[in-house]
Amino acid sequence: MKPKKPYETLDPENWDEMRALAHRMVDDAITYLETVRERPVWQPIPDVIAARFDAPAPHEPVGADAVYKEFSETILPYPMGNIHPRFWGWYMGSGTVLGALADFLASIMNPNLGGGNHVANLVEDQVINWIKEMLSFPKDSSGLLVGGGSMANFVGI
């Protein structure tokens, strides 16, 4: 058993290894998006893969490399299909490289708009002002950014 650290942390044990894994993930993700047209829009999940999701909870740590390998084998190959250009199921837009990178940067900052004097409040205000301008809404009208169509409908009600 490893000796307990004087404090708990979620930081990686080795930043260089984490950096290398992160670069590999970005490279793989860009290749995945770049080659989306070479794959079917959707494919069924093989029984052997589905069975891997009926496992007991892990009780020991698993390294980030192993988790990424599991993701690459069991999750990434079997999407809904909405990032494919021939997916015509409904309005959901496709994933984009810049959208994914923007999500990554937002996740790194982990902002919230619950209060405080930080830049996320200014970003939301700016985006709302741009939308008001595009829609010719009055400058003194208000707005709110939400996470998706369901929440927008809920707020609208």
Residue ranges and their predicted role:
Residues 2-140:
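N-terminal entrance/gating region of PLP-dependent enzymes' catalytic architecture
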Residues 124, 128, 141-157:
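Conserved beta-loop-alpha segment that forms the PLP phosphate-binding cup at the N-terminus of a helix
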